[in-house]
Amino acid sequence: AKNKSPEMNIICCVDDAPEKVGRSIMGIEIMGTTEDIPELVERCEIETILFAIPTVDDENKRRILSICNKTKCNVRILPDIVQLIANGGKDVLSRVRDVRVEDVLGREQIELTDLTNTLVSGKVVMVTGGGGSIGSELCRQIAACGPKRLIIVDIYENSAYSVQQELKRRYGSALKLDVCIASVRDSKKVDRLFARYQPDVVFHAAAHKHVPLMEDAPEEAVKNNVFGTYNVALSADKYGVGRFVLISTDKAVNPTNVMGATKRLCEMIVQALAQKSKTKFVAVRFGNVLGSNGSVLPLFKEQIAAGGPVTVTHPDIVRYFMTIPEAVRLVLEAGAMGNGGDIFVLDMGNPVKILDLAENLIKLSGFIPYRDIEIKFTGLRPGEKLYEELLMDEEGLRQTDNKKIFVGAPLKLNKDTFFDHLATLKQIAYSNNSDNLVQALIDLVPTFHHAENNYD
């Protein structure tokens, strides 16, 4: 298409069915297949490419977008026909969107069942860390399911306020919403919140998650992640919560950094409590989330906007990715099906090279990698792996009714010994002795191999 304000002038079409080449659609000729896009762009002086097959499979979407990226055209994506019909065919151009990194990654959406509605509909639901990237999306999706009451707990008032205002605008008085500014480290405050609201379901998303920062402040990671989880989980057990869902991470598997080790301890806490509690404690473990606070995508966008360079730690580093809504669908679905002590993991497809992600984002921003925007390799940070794992060998794996969700068998823990060691860890953490603390983590988490100076 050529851009002619306020509308576009459609010049030609392409279709991957060779037999359609030469035909016309409403007077617009089909002049080739997708492989012909670069040549047609040059010959017809095309400025914008409209991607009008949003239901195409992931592999072909990536292939076609890769061809489009070889041109200097602005690439836009049309909504699917269902969206257009739902809108009465009005304002079509306003619904055309830019290509997003998610389109290039091609993540297949998780299909939810009625379990999710059963979990939260008509229930009192508490979300800790409810102002964060995952927590706020949890609140959005829970609110859409019609809870009896939604309680957002967060220490950061600005993010909590933002979610509160968004949900008020969307639901008004139809949603009973309470926002509580509180730290999960404060066991007495946590206890009072549970006594007051008597939640049926708790999603525990509050945590420190930045690997390099937690390497420099391991005592803060332990206080917030480990004992924040301990406080919330104990209150859930005390007040008879039906389900407790811990938001975990693939960095908890064979951890090489403090943050991952603390998240593994969080999993061990809920697995230990599950042995004696009527509350169904489960954990949901997933990889990196696109666009979350502090994740690589916003960082790359900032670096591109500043003219570069885009910093990648290692040319071979790979990560599993999913979108925030996808991650939350997993949490809700798995939380609904879990039994006590289960750890759920997502079939996350193929890992993505961070270098490929950086190059694609530069292209999507209208620049050419290494020419317009430089990519700089900075070296692995302390505790950082080239690749992440999703499951420890001893956990085993079986598929659930959802083909994208798997569950690992609960590990057997001597809960009395475990909680004794946890008490020792707490004493060390609050003495702010970082050296002894890391060793205490190693003693508690047998799979923790601390890579203190891992720059290779």
PLM feature spans:
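A solvent-exposed beta-alpha-beta segment
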Residues: 1-74, 155-162, 169, 177-178, ...
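N-terminal Rossmann NAD(P)H-binding glycine-rich loop of SDR-like oxidoreductase domains
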Residues: 125-143
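NAD(P)-cofactor binding segment of oxidoreductase domains
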Residues: 62-78, 149-156, 196, 201, ...
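Strand-loop microenvironment adjacent to phosphate/nucleotide-handling motifs in alpha/beta enzyme folds
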Residues: 115-119, 268-289, 293-456
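Conserved Rossmann-fold NAD(P)-dependent oxidoreductase catalytic core, especially the SDR/UDP-sugar
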Residues: 86-87, 204, 208-267, 272-274
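Conserved Rossmann-fold cofactor-binding substructure of NAD(P)-dependent oxidoreductases
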Residues: 181-201, 383
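Proline-aspartate-enriched helix->loop->beta-strand connector
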Residues: 41, 45-47, 147-148, 194, ...
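Flexible, Lys/Arg-rich cytosolic regulatory linkers and terminal tails that connect or flank
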Residues: 34, 61-124, 237
